Amino acid sequence: VTTWTDHTADRPISLTAPSGIDRAAHHRLDEAWLAAAWSHPSTRCFVVSGGQVLIDETPDGATELVMTPSFEAPLTEAHRYFLGTDEEGTSFFALQKDSLPGRMDQSARPAGLREAGLLLSDRDAGLMAHAVALENWQRLHRFCSRCGERTVIAAAGHIRRCPACGAEHYPRTDPAVIMAVTDGEDRILLGRQVHWPEGRFSTLAGFVEPGESIEQSVRREVQEEVGVTVGPVEYVASQPWPFPSSLMLGFMAHATSTGINVDGDEIHEARWFSRDELGAAFESGEVLPPYGISIAARLIELWYGKPLPTRGAF
């Protein structure tokens, strides 16, 4: 597998750029340290609820997470997750609650990761992705998979422990491959899932199966979904996608066949596009580009040679 690191350096994919946060995993089991960090006046926290946070606009027009000093944040009916520290030693926590707090001013508003990830700084986007992933995992794994008893939160949100049998459960991450497939004529293969509306096309993707390498997964998914055979596979970049717990592994893949035979179960339609054809389809509205935060958009851009239009993006 070769990599496209040089091609992505100038425009890093959303949620992959360095966040400047040290996750400091060695502190997660240190209750005394966590208590001291929580009570420190520099510590900041924010609320996550249902995959959303509050964001606000700064005086200079940037967008940031709405955070408060931790000592001002009540822990009533909230789960506390330690997210890490920055270079200045500031600690960051997320509070999982049933609802977001009341807006602090008229400009603050709730936002999910798909929207906020495009607007926030690398630091804030990384903190939000971490918090949303933990919230999703906590919500879906409340009971022990070994004995069925209810588990409790440990390690500042990064472990669920079963008091009944002693089992420890860790946050789940599901690897998935996503690939921009091109052919000998340098066309790109895009597909439309069965539940997507007309015009919504993107790169092919699928989960890695047990006992399978990521390269094997790329070739299998393309063959299963559209009947196209893939040869060389080139790794590009990865992207956390906590909806609820995926890690997207992005590839460029070269097809050794071009005949399309969609499976009808996952993919309803698939087409080869030249750059001119795709550009014209974007312009006419025949094809809607993927949303800018997604690794799918960046994979297509690497082939397309320029940013995708934002009008009509999904």
Question: Which residues fall in each region the model found?
Answer:
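Nudix hydrolase/Nudix homology domain
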Residues: 1-141, 152, 196-201, 263-314
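Conserved hydrophobic/aromatic beta-strand scaffold that supports enzyme active sites
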Residues: 82, 143, 178-180, 190, ...
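Cys/His-rich short segments
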Residues: 130-182
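Short, well-structured beta-strand/strand-turn elements
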Residues: 152-155, 227-236
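N-terminal strand-loop-strand
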Residues: 160-202, 207, 229-230, 253
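Hydrophobic alpha-helical positions that pack around
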Residues: 204, 218, 222
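Surface-exposed, charge/polar-rich loops and edge strands
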Residues: 212
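Active-site-adjacent beta-strand/loop module that shapes the phosphate/pyrophosphate-binding cleft
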Residues: 239-262
